[in-house]
């Protein structure tokens, strides 16, 4: 519930909402909120008090509410290890699906150098200020990683991904790191986290959901 206070004497109405146990955002413009009113009230569970003249602060608070819903509707794909399982994160409700790491690099090996991959590689090389080490084939392989991850997300009905990148590179099961793929995903507003780090991926996801 969004409560917009317009008078210093309106806090009793906000108290009614708080006592009802309904999560509330209380917008109290400067002049309607002083220490006596805010000190204890702002510490009540489920209450977020905004004392500002800027209504954008309300918009940001509502984005946080929206982000909570988005987390609950998200499935994060974790590519690591050799087991398949799915759990649900406490409080946030995000589904975390773990699949064997082999799934990724085996799909990569089957992924042809599609026109999409060539176009992505061409675009990345064209947009680069300078190219020090990667060969043309390196960028094509990096683009294949992007296409592979897209297919994997679709196959697993997931909205975000984090992979055991270093593990795949050090064991040489993929020819290039998936870093460019991660960059392209992030640019598109889709989370691609590094090193199969669930909490790192969740942090990336939060920044996307708050935009």
Language-model features and meaning:
Residues 1-211:
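An N-terminal assembly and electron-transfer interface module characteristic of large anaerobic redox
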